[in-house]
């Protein structure tokens, strides 16, 4: 019998790869996505279309409005930076977002009787978000086992799986391709056009393009400002 696992699934490149890995490792994946007022909701639409074809047993979309909190270019009128990937934590950071997401995942996991949670965080080719670091994940896992009925009663130990955390974006892409992931059915851009095209200039687009260039594979998604993503990604490094 396959073990159940909750997989945080945004519809982006990393989380799609993470879902494929969970399934390949023999888990029954229960995908969880969020509609939280994000400006790049086209990513969520990809998640809705692809969760079950990707092998998810169930797909739960949690709805809440992070715009009430604000403080991020993804949930307010703050402009999304287009100058390149910097060294400081960017304004696209959503305050405590992974803590909120993982808490929802933990709650669902406890209800399902699942003790495994997958999240596609990465600490190499990323924008410097503090809630993507290994020490954060370790701290949340410890908290999960202290803060739940299942944890304190010893019914099992919750584990937070981060299979991408020490991989480069190119390595993530190669891994996904080896598992049959169709990256043309993913979305990464923080600031897409009204038609849903990726901008090609935000942090997320730049990291994605760089990853495909280093993997030696053309990015299959359409960009509003780039005619040849493979060439553009090499030039932007």
UniProtKB/Swiss-Prot annotation:
Protein residues bound to Zn(2+): 189, 199, 202, 205
GO biological process: queuosine biosynthetic process
EC number(s) given by UniProt: 6.3.4.20
Broad enzyme group: ligase
Gene3D superfamilies cross-referenced by the UniProt entry: HUPs (3.40.50.620)
Names of the cofactor(s): Zn(2+)
Keyword Zinc: yes
Pfam families: QueC
GO molecular function terms attached to this record: ATP binding; ligase activity, forming carbon-nitrogen bonds; zinc ion binding
Pathway recorded for this protein: Purine metabolism; 7-cyano-7-deazaguanine biosynthesis
UniProt keyword list: ATP-binding, Ligase, Metal-binding, Nucleotide-binding, Queuosine biosynthesis, Zinc
Catalytic activity of the protein: 7-carboxy-7-deazaguanine + NH4(+) + ATP = 7-cyano-7-deazaguanine + ADP + phosphate + H2O + H(+)
Cofactor detail note: Binds 1 zinc ion per subunit.
Residues the entry annotates as binding ATP: 9-19
Protein family according to the UniProt entry: Belongs to the QueC family.
Stated role: Catalyzes the ATP-dependent conversion of 7-carboxy-7-deazaguanine (CDG) to 7-cyano-7-deazaguanine (preQ(0)).
UniProt cross-references to HAMAP family, sorted A to Z: QueC
Protein name: 7-cyano-7-deazaguanine synthase
């Amino acid at each position: 019998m396959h073990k159940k696992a909750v997989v945080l699934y945004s519809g982006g490149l990393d989380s799609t790869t993470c879902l494929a890995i969970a399934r390949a490792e023999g888990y029954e994946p229960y995908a969880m996505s969020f509609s939280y007022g994000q400006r790049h909701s086209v990513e969520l639409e990809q998640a809705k279309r692809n969760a079950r074809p990707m092998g998810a047993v169930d797909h739960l979309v949690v709805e809440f409005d992070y715009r009430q909190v604000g403080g991020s270019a993804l949930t307010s009128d703050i402009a999304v930076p287009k100058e390149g990937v910097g060294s400081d934590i960017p304004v696209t950071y959503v305050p405590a977002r992974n803590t909120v997401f993982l808490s929802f995942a933990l709650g669902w996991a406890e209800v399902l009787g699942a003790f495994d949670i997958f999240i596609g965080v990465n600490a190499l080719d990323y924008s410097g978000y503090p809630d993507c670091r290994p020490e954060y994940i370790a701290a949340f896992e410890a908290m999960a086992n202290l803060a739940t009925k299942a944890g304190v009663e010893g019914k099992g130990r919750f584990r937070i799986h981060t299979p991408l955390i020490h991989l480069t974006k190119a390595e993530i892409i190669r891994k996904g391709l080896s598992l049959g992931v169709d990256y043309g059915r993913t979305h990464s851009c923080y600031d897409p056009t009204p038609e849903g095209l990726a901008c090609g200039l935000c942090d997320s687009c730049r990291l994605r393009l760089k990853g495909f260039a280093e993997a030696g594979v053309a990015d299959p998604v359409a960009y509003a400002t780039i005619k040849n993503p493979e060439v553009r990604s090499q030039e932007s490094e």
